[in-house]
């Protein structure tokens, strides 16, 4: 198996792992399709009602970020070998920072949120420590999202310079990432799944062309 196909595997698996993690809390007998958008108290009650699944969901989503880092590290090696070292390395630094932030955020949701959820069920009120920590967690998420979109745009520019894939892939990655970044800056929120779409496309094309 050549390096293109090897690189494709973690990029595709990252999307699969994230999709599993994002789907777990919203399906099944105790699933809640609105669990990610509920008010604080209702969110904690929903988590408490499905705590084990919530933990596994965040494990899968944390693993997805690590797989993404592995895949993009391998892609960076290919891009450097093709002579493009600036944008690919900037992209990798950005992804590394974003993944660290996301893993911390996922751990926060898997541990602190579950603990607060159990206390909410026991006392009937949201623990006073939780909302400040939730705001801190969202700040982590926001920085993660901004950095990740910028990193993906850098990879799009790098792809354009080396011709590893058709030019539309590079342009599509840049345009999609910048558009989602602008939407984030306007609305203040985004779906983390958006960070996995360009790498999924890149992974599929590398697999097909490998």
What are these regions (language model features)?
Residues 1-210:
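Hydrophobic, aromatic-enriched alpha-helical segments typical of multi-pass transmembrane helices
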């Amino acid at each position: 198996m050549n390096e293109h196909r090897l690189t494709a595997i973690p990029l595709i698996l990252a999307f699969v792992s994230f999709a599993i993690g994002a789907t777990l809390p919203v399906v099944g007998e105790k699933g809640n399709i609105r669990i990610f958008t509920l008010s604080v108290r209702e969110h904690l009650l929903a988590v408490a009602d499905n705590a084990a699944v919530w933990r596994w969901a965040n494990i899968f989503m944390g693993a997805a970020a690590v797989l993404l880092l592995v895949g993009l590290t391998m892609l960076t090696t290919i891009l450097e070998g093709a002579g493009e070292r600036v944008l690919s390395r900037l992209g990798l630094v950005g992804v590394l920072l974003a993944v660290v932030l996301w893993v911390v955020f996922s751990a926060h949701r898997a541990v602190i949120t579950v603990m607060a959820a159990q206390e909410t069920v026991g006392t009937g009120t949201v623990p006073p420590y939780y909302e400040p920590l939730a705001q801190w967690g969202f700040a982590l998420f926001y920085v993660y999202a901004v950095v990740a979109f910028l990193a993906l745009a850098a990879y799009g520019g790098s792809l354009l310079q080396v011709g590893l894939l058709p030019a539309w892939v590079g342009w599509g990655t840049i345009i999609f990432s910048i558009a989602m970044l602008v939407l984030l800056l306007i609305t203040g929120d985004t779906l983390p799944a958006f960070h996995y779409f360009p790498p999924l496309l890149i992974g599929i094309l590398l697999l097909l062309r490998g």
